C-alpha cells in the first residue's frame, strides 16, 4: 500500500494550484465549472478523475482553505443515483443546482414502523395516469425543512416479493399534501423531521429508473454514503480539520491545560488514522478492488471525529 501522494511538481497538482491562483476565493459556481466539487463524476459535472486525482484536488483545496458547497445528501447520495439511473432530462435539470448548493436535498427512506429496514417500507405510491398518488410517512429526515427536494422510496406494487415492489422517486418538498413536522431534541435543536404524505400527487416523470427498481437504487445510494473520500478530520468533508484546530491553538499561543493537550493529541492521532485509512481505500480502488470494511470504518469514525473537532 502506497501512503505517498504525488509530489508538488505533479502536473495535476500544479493545475489545481494555478487555478486557485486565479480564483483565490472561488464561488460555488466556479468550483462546479472547474469540476472540483465532484472530480470523479463524468463531464460536464466533473473531470472523470480517478481516486488519486480526486485526493490531489481535495488536498490542494484544503491547503487553500477552500470549502465545497454543503449539500451532503444531494451531492453524496442523490447525485450518484441520478448518474446511475436518471434520465438525461433529470440529470440536466437537477445535477448542476444540486452541485452549487442552490437546491438542497434530503433523504426520505426510514419509516416509523420500519426504521431502516427498507424492504418493509409501507409508504404507497399508486399510479394514476401520469402521476403517482403517495400516502404514508417518513421519519428522521435530516434537514427536510431546509430542502427543496428529497430522494423517496415507496411501495408501488404490494403483490410481488417486498424487495421487488419498491420504486425510487425525486420528491419536491413543496407538493400539496406533503407536510414536515419538526422533531426537536432534548437540547431544543431541530435537525430531524417526520414527513407526512396525504394524497401527494407526484409526476411519473420524477420516478428514477423503472418501476420496481427502488431496492437496487437504494443500495446504490447507501453505497455512496459509505464510501467517501473527504478530507480526514472534517465533518462530511466540510468545516475545520484537526490540523486546522491545532493551527488555531498554536496561533493563539498554545494550550497549557494538560487534559486539553491530551485531547488535542488524540484528535491529531485520529486524523492520521483517518488519512491512512482513506489512502487504503484509495489503494483498493486503484487496484480494481471493491472497498471493504475500511470504508464502513471510515464512515463511523470520521463523523464522530469531525463532531469532536
Spans of features found by a protein language model:
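Amphipathic, small/basic residue-rich leader segments at the start of a protein or domain
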Residues: 1-72, 83, 92-100, 104, ...
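Glycine-rich beta->alpha junctions and the first turn(s) of the following alpha-helix
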Residues: 3-7, 178-276
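Alpha-helix capping/hinge segments and adjacent helical runs
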Residues: 21-22, 43, 47, 141, ...
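N-terminal glycine-rich flavin-associated loop
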Residues: 70-89, 115
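A short, Trp-centered hydrophobic/proline-enriched beta-strand micro-motif
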Residues: 101-109, 153
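A structural signal for short hydrophobic beta-strand segments in well-ordered beta-sheet cores
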Residues: 123-126
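A short core secondary-structure module
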Residues: 130-131, 135-181
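C-terminal helix-coil-helix/basic helical segment that borders enzyme active sites and/or dimer interfaces
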Residues: 258-261, 272-309
Amino acid at each position: 500500500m502506497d501512503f505517498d501522494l504525488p509530489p508538488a511538481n505533479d502536473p495535476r497538482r500544479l493545475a489545481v494550484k494555478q487555478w486557485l491562483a486565479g480564483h483565490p476565493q472561488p464561488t460555488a459556481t466556479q468550483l462546479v465549472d472547474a469540476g472540483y466539487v465532484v472530480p470523479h463524476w463524468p463531464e460536464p459535472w466533473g473531470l472523470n478523475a480517478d481516486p488519486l486525482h480526486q485526493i490531489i484536488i481535495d488536498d490542494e483545496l484544503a491547503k487553500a482553505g477552500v470549502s465545497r458547497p454543503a449539500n451532503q445528501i444531494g451531492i453524496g447520495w442523490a447525485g450518484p443515483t441520478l448518474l446511475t439511473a436518471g434520465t438525461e432530462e433529470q440529470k440536466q435539470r437537477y445535477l448542476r443546482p444540486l452541485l452549487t448548493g442552490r437546491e438542497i436535498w434530503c433523504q426520505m427512506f426510514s419509516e416509523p414502523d420500519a426504521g431502516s429496514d427498507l424492504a418493509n417500507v409501507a409508504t404507497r405510491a399508486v399510479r394514476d395516469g401520469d402521476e403517482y398518488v403517495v400516502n404514508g410517512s417518513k421519519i428522521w429526515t435530516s434537514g427536510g425543512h431546509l430542502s427543496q427536494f428529497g430522494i423517496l422510496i415507496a411501495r408501488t406494487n404490494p403483490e410481488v416479493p417486498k424487495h421487488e415492489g419498491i420504486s425510487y422517486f425525486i420528491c419536491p418538498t413543496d407538493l400539496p399534501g406533503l407536510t414536515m413536522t419538526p422533531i426537536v431534541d432534548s437540547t431544543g435543536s431541530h435537525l430531524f423531521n417526520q414527513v407526512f404524505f396525504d394524497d401527494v400527487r407526484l409526476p411519473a416523470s420524477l420516478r428514477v429508473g423503472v418501476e420496481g427498481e427502488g431496492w437496487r437504487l437504494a443500495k446504490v445510494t447507501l453505497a455512496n454514503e459509505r464510501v467517501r473520500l473527504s478530507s480526514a478530520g472534517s465533518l462530511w468533508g466540510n468545516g475545520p480539520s484537526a490540523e486546522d484546530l491545532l493551527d488555531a491553538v498554536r496561533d493563539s499561543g498554545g494550550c497549557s491545560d494538560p487534559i486539553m493537550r491530551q485531547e488535542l493529541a488524540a484528535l491529531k492521532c485520529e486524523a492520521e488514522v483517518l488519512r491512512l485509512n482513506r489512502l487504503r481505500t484509495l489503494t483498493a480502488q486503484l487496484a480494481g478492488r471493491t472497498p471493504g470494511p475500511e470504508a464502513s470504518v471510515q464512515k463511523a469514525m470520521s463523523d464522530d471525529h469531525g463532531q469532536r473537532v
